[in-house]
From Swiss-Prot:
Family: Belongs to the 3-HAO family.
Subunit structure: Monomer.
Species: Bos taurus (Bovine)
One GO location term (cellular component): cytoplasm
Enzyme Commission number(s): 1.13.11.6
Binding site for substrate: E53, R95, E105
Residue ranges the record marks as coiled coil: none
Protein name: 3-hydroxyanthranilate 3,4-dioxygenase
Locations listed in the record: Cytoplasm, Cytosol
Region Domain A (catalytic): start-end pairs: 1-160
Amino acid sequence: MERPVRVKAWVEENRGSFLPPVCNKLLHQKQLKIMFVGGPNTRKDYHIEEGEEVFYQLEGDMLLRVLERGKHRDVVIRQGEIFLLPAGVPHSPQRFANTVGLVIERRRLKTELDGLRYYVGDTTDVLFEKWFYCEDLGTQLAPIIQEFFSSEQYRTGKPNPDQLLKEPPFPLSTRSVMEPMCLEAWLDGHRKELQAGTPLSLFGDTYESQVMVHGQGSSEGLRRDVDVWLWQLEGSSVVTMEGQRLSLTLDDSLLVPAGTLYGWERGQGSVALSVTQDPACKKSLG
């Protein structure tokens, strides 16, 4: 059975994994992939997927380069800020020394493909691309990147039309990319609702990712096909699952695996996140 994990203590214990050349380590790898990423790590490649990604910066800032509605844009995610990247947005994370960030994504459906692209200079013309079924991005990216650096396209800076798809396997997103938000400031602005026991959504209901903030109160749930990740931001709570009571105190996290019935009691002063990513709720990329 899953046990609570204190996030900052876990990060400290695994700090060596956030340095080059690895730069990341998974906390959970089930239906939800909960990972922490460090640096320095600067990249030229852009990743594209049919699911969404949640970013939160624990230590220091990062830069996320995106292709938004046909134009390049730099999104700075500062320490303490949270951000939701829509599905189908080409993105290239740039991370710096002495930084650590949380990234949450989900297991791919068997029908979904990921893409890795390089563009010609600062244009939106595709120089090189590979589409693949993603099982472990950490091990699958390196061979593709090496293939690019050994390619004629890399040497000449010119694409080979015969190796580019006329159309990608799925349409790129036409949604605008949101601005990152300071989580602490958001909490301060919604304390009355949270104290009244009203769960609040950070990003609304137009995404498959549901990042909910819970104040005091109780709830129970059973998500048959998706994991639920809980993170205690303030105060304490108690989760009951599989006949056991698990106490969560400040900075504790807990993964509730898919198909697990759980109850959640949150006392006065409790503030906690719950995160799910349900592909059954996928939105149109248009």
